[in-house]
Regions:
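Charged low-complexity interaction tracts in eukaryotic proteins
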Residues: 1-4, 21, 30-79
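Short capping segments at the starts of secondary-structure elements
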Residues: 12-19
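Long, charge-rich, low-complexity intrinsically disordered regions
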Residues: 94-100, 104
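Catalytic cores of nucleic-acid endonucleases
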Residues: 129, 135-149, 154-223
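C-terminal helix of von Willebrand factor
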Residues: 216-244
Length: 244
């Protein structure tokens, strides 16, 4: 079997689409395909860019051209879908990537109650987040604010190690205010958004209200999250092979 055929098979078995991270973890498991290269993950990345067979849906997510009209709405929304719903699908997708990254990195992952039933590539977010209820790590009013954050990674001491807000079009101020509530904890704060919002991010963060956290908040683009997801998955695949 040729390498591109192995990628096609994995996608077909997954419904005609897959994240690059999913491909990294599964393509090399196909026994009758030989990868005579020291950089198989780079080869997979190159293969999915072959527009004879594949097309890109969003950062980190690819599909088979043969399945274009068969994909679920949350994977590839039709142009007739309301803009709000398309934005919700995109928002949930990046939440899902962050949850999966956290899971691989051995964190406890949490998503808010209002998002648990949203679909991430055919699965509810609640099905991939590792904890259902937020840890009571502080006073009630602090936890109440934290439980609305898009994704939280909790460490082994049940404390919030990293918190993420995915922002497509809403005001970044709301997310930064949530981070302010957690300023007394040793947490990393991350805003995930389109690169076009970088200037807006820095403008908001420069306000006096956010001075206490200004050096702790970082901006991640959608592309950076997708890249982290694929590389984290590739590392996990190597570790599994070596039985680490």
């Amino acid at each position: 079997m040729k390498q591109y055929e192995a990628v096609i098979r994995v996608m077909e078995e997954n419904g005609g689409y897959a994240t690059l991270g999913f491909l990294n973890q599964n393509v090399l498991k196909i026994a009758d395909c030989k990868w005579g290269t020291k950089t198989p993950f780079a080869s997979i990345r190159r293969i999915v860019q072959d527009d004879r067979f594949f097309f890109k849906i969003r950062p980190g997510l690819w599909a088979l051209k043969s399945h274009r009209g068969k994909l679920p709405s949350e994977v590839l929304p039709s142009k007739d879908e309301p803009k709000e719903l398309q934005e919700e699908y995109s928002h949930t997708y990046f939440q899902g990537l962050l949850v999966e990254i956290g899971n691989v990195r051995k964190y406890q992952t949490f998503v808010p109650n209002q998002d648990k039933n949203r679909l991430y590539l055919g699965k509810k977010l609640s099905a991939i987040a590792s904890i259902n209820d937020i840890h009571r790590f502080s006073f009630d009013h602090v936890v109440a604010k934290a439980k609305t954050i898009d994704v939280i990674w909790f460490n082994e001491r049940d404390m919030p190690a990293s918190v993420f807000e995915v922002e497509h079009s809403t005001d970044l101020r709301n997310s930064l205010l949530k981070f302010v509530e957690l300023q007394d904890f040793n947490s990393k704060f991350r805003i995930v958004a389109d690169t076009a919002r970088t200037k807006e991010f820095h403008a908001r963060l420069s306000l006096d209200a956010f001075r206490p956290i200004s050096n702790r908040v970082k901006f991640w683009t959608y592309e950076e999250v997708a890249d982290l997801h694929s590389k984290t998955s590739a590392l996990a695949a190597v570790e599994a092979k070596l039985e680490l």
